[in-house]
């Protein structure tokens, strides 16, 4: 048995590994020749990944091609020392051009196959976008040792035989690759799979049902971007992939509130109501920014790692990106050991952007996820499921689509206990929905959404997301943000940045004195903008560079400067569809109910496996003259019989006027954001003058940041020690703010871009 190290050896780490990260990679080859100790430190940095980055090889990315890789690197594999070959763990061909010379003679995949069999420890393969590489052929003999395979965009499919050899694979990315997913449905296939990415694979609800039933809680990350999923798929994910143990508790009742559970219905799930404490509804408890204290077992019967408890919020979220998982499997992650990437306690990372889900489906999933999700992405969702074939469709404006997410209470830690990284439609913060109306321009839709729908959305859901609603969230991405605004959108985003600055100051004050550990707060805020909606000269809009616009100190560019003096457009009204003849009898019967002074409807629902009658709140008849949103909700419930998604009132709905203990029709409530049949609420197209007044959101945000930074630097210069605390009075947020625009290609702006 080896002797234990001395105390001095144990507390005095070798200095060489400590300084290695700061050494220039171009010096690695020379340092390997110093002695064996240096070789042990620097040789893995050269050979762990093939091809190595240009910082080691001295080659530019443009010089990488498959000819170079196979002829200069793999040709000499058979003559290299086995000790050196054993260092190779990653084959990353993503930066290499996907073409090769016909003069190579030997088939590309055959040559690669002959080379990789000399690499006993190769376990990560990344070949995204390559047309010439077929993993089923190239890596047939080493499939059993592969733990990560990323082949997004490859026009080849994996053979069933090869998939059966991937017994130890942890990460698999088949996004936009050719071939069916049917091989994944075999019994006892991919037993160690933990991360599955299948973007753009035409996946439907049935496929997700089969997939989730097959893998269950084995997956901790599932990426389903750009498929054909509806709310039914979210139900399948919630039923099969989430670990059964509940992370929610009443321990933090004073700070966060607590949950009260009721019956279970098929379309809404378990009725879950938030019971507020004296502080929780205002998100103002003095202890809201502290990390969780350690949880001790009263009887000391379980090891601490086996106790089911939420994360304390102190450490970052484990990433499911290919590079991050690759580093983690090699033991290079500073926070998570390789075992954490290979183990699973159910789904924690879910991405369903680019699908056909609704906000109600997302609300149900987040409500019933037992606090397990740590990272959730859904860039756009319909406000309600499709209305075709229902009486409600008669009252919804013809050919209208509404997108948004208002269930902000589901992001609170009392429900989403572990949620740290979020990507959602911008309405979660701005309360402004995305509107699509047939016959109306994009600019007109933006104006209508801000000036007609926003006031109604504020009536329905008077509780937008704010940073202290969940200070455990560290990263927030808002999507589908319009480039043009008549004012409300700009004001909402600016107000949110001010709240971020205020949170930053509160955390700074707490961390500057002795006390419990403090949460990081929201440190990464990303804004994803849509393409500019200007339609008068589309070719001009396509040439506008957002970076140049934001970096300039000039007034924001106006697309309408040449037309400001033009005559207003004739006003058009969007009429609602007249009732069809077959519906008149039903409407007249419902009108009789509406004339009653009832505030509740008796509805038969299927609860816990049996039919039960419940009372659902429909509003008071006295609200018809004072609150148009409540008036339309009542009409949708009584007149149109929109009686689905029955559930407890959310905190926002209670603030809007719903009794705290009431049940509501959630679909009807969301639909009431859109004006119904009332003549006074007819949607009119804005005039050219009104559209001319809309400002560029990017330009206004840039101006706000420049003014805040100027104040910050001035206060910093006036300080005796040259420092300035965050927050008021300058209000300049010091976190990482990113912007992306969809103009030609997606361009991302770094944090320095805003400073």
Language-model features: locations:
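Extended, low-complexity alpha-biased scaffolding regions
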Residues: 41, 49, 53, 57-77, ...
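N-terminal adaptor-interaction module of cullin-RING ubiquitin ligase components
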Residues: 1-107, 133-141, 159-163, 184-185, ...
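A structural signal for leucine-rich repeat
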Residues: 113-117, 137-145, 160-169, 183-192, ...
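Short, solvent-exposed loop/turn at the beta-strand->alpha-helix junction
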Residues: 97-108, 129-136, 153-160, 176-183, ...
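Extended, C-terminal alpha-helical/coiled-coil scaffolding tails that mediate protein-protein interactions
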Residues: 15-18, 111, 524-529, 533-755
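Conserved hydrophobic beta-strand positions in leucine-rich repeat
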Residues: 91, 125, 147-151, 170-174, ...
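Extended HEAT/HEAT-like alpha-solenoid repeat tracts in very large eukaryotic scaffold/adaptor proteins
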Residues: 87, 339-354, 411-418, 465-478, ...
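Acidic, serine/threonine- and proline-enriched intrinsically disordered linkers and terminal tails
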Residues: 236-343, 380-399, 429, 435-455
